[in-house]
């Protein structure tokens, strides 16, 4: 089996995705995150597989950079990062509950949950 890859096609695909973005929606999402962060709310992010890595990366950058750039604290957590907790919920309850159970324990009204999915197919 031969893997066919073209840098040119890869770049074209990324340009197509970028051009399809709804800029107003993206700006609205950024503003929501900023408002929650600067009002002291918790922001939790989660995802499965590669999306879990993306979620972790967002929180890493936000926790570090918000403080370094503004001097303000950022209260962010990635629900995918605690492997022991994720697998405990998966084993004792169901994989469907690995994030919802953490949300019950960590988030309060008006906090923010961001779910990341590259495929859109995850049911949890």
Question: Language model features by range: what are they?
Answer:
Residues 1-21:
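Generic N-terminal amphipathic, Lys/Arg-enriched alpha-helix
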Residues 3, 22-26, 51:
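Residue-level recognition of alpha-helical structural elements
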Residues 7, 26-29, 55:
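Hydrophobic packing residues in well-ordered alpha-helices of helical domains and bundles
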Residues 13, 25-28, 124:
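Charged catalytic carboxylate motif
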Residues 21-39:
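A short, well-structured juxtamembrane/interface segment
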Residues 35-107:
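Glycine-rich, small/polar surface segments that engage phosphate groups of diverse ligands
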Residues 109-123:
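C-terminal binding/interaction regions
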